């Protein structure tokens, strides 16, 4: 086998990409923040120029997130908690995918530009590798089932990116040499995803409520939306994207062995059953939004260990509505369609998205709370009170991450995969119908991205309450709004338990109050800006 040096590969890669048309490639500025040198300069259409502005916003948000919050020595975001760090890592991997996916290199390239892109990608990819070692895995192994499943989704996102980038990097050429170096991380990422998937799978319980995942092994049974959505999303993502794992540590048994395979039917089965259970659980409200979850009336564990199962049914509903509970299900819907070809999964997703958009008031942009936002912009209920917890600050970004995945066009490798998994392959008409529905969300997405952008401060950091522009002139109006809203009787925001205190409603920009700007709020902006980049690059 002929071995090629890295330099030879790059030269041949560049040669392959020498301009076919007279158009010049996007040039990459060495410093993405240098206003004198826009990131992309192109002779292409206005649409492309516009989407390159969106890409610039994505890169700026990512750079500020990593420079401000990521601690390279520790390999993690120092102020994050374990699950929000797992989500931050997912955003970084998904953003890399979005950047590379959206770049149209096919119209010709200049080698130095490509080398600079390579450097941008490698910089952040290396940081995800640092995080592999910085992630608090020993603690996470004993946390709630949803915590474990965020870990699964994060490392699958990393292997998805590596697979895509390795293919893209080769650009159709078959190099008789070692593949893209980043693939070295994938077996480790796959191993971690597999181990945490197995740890979480024991949360499935049929002794109560005829099924469903339990949220937390050490608390009274609570079957909530997020854990079930995560189990459905993680199961179908394992089925589709898990590249296999030959590392049997930390244990191997006959039951666990089944989970090591690629396209494992056990993963598909878990996805179908948890998706179905959740859909039929009665967890949605009249607006069609997922509420938080079910307790079992009367369930009790006596000190001697005896359990009184109470009614044994999911009959005590926590009616709080959060943005992230409308998001993760979308990845499950998309994956189940890809794995089965069944249109109903896509319809479920579009219905949920439509309900969310309606619950922001859109296209109405007045100041009245509509259930999940106001002014056409997504909000957490806690946003207006400036008391969102670290959990609450993470939610909107999760929604947009999964919305973007839901509407991400299929790559050629995914179409091939579907052809192998679904008899006859995917129905093109259904796929095009799906893309058309996705395209129709663009205005709402731009509206939300622009609202998030308006919260950006001089350091490039974003706030949590997207409806309040940075240094707003209308501060008195916002302050009155902040104390002006209450939850329906009997609903308690247990994820953001702080009461509005006068110390939160002090001075300064509203988005600096409460917990202020954090890696979590930054990741939320990153996600919505990336959605804008995807919609502009793909759908306009
Ligand atoms: C593109 O950008 C121009 C100038 O910023 C703006 O007027 C136009 O509406 C944008 N087009 C789209 C499709 O966003
Ligand atoms: C696992 O080992 C088998 C047999 O050696 C090999 O074919 C396969 O590619 C390996 N899978 C992974 C993910 O390394
Ligand atoms: C455990 O305690 C409960 C409540 O005191 C009692 O009803 C039950 O019989 C006890 N079970 C055992 C096995 O002792
Ligand atoms: C606050 O609530 C009162 C009573 O519902 C309403 O009249 C007022 O307009 C609200 N203020 C704002 C800023 O929304």
Could you say what each language-model-derived stretch is?
Residues 94, 127, 150, 157, ...:
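Alpha-helical scaffold segments in carbohydrate-active enzymes
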Residues 138, 149, 153-281, 286-288, ...:
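Fungal eukaryote-biased detector of long internal structured cores
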Residues 97-105, 154, 161-168, 203, ...:
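Alpha-solenoid helical repeat scaffolds
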Residues 84-87, 140-143, 147-150, 185, ...:
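Structural signature of alpha-solenoid helical repeat junctions
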Residues 59-67, 234, 283-316, 529:
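Extended glycan-interaction surfaces of carbohydrate-active proteins
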Residues 319-320:
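Outer-membrane beta-barrel proteins
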Residues 1-26:
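Fungal secretory targeting signals
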Residues 26-131, 140-146, 182, 203-204, ...:
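CBM-like carbohydrate-recognition segments
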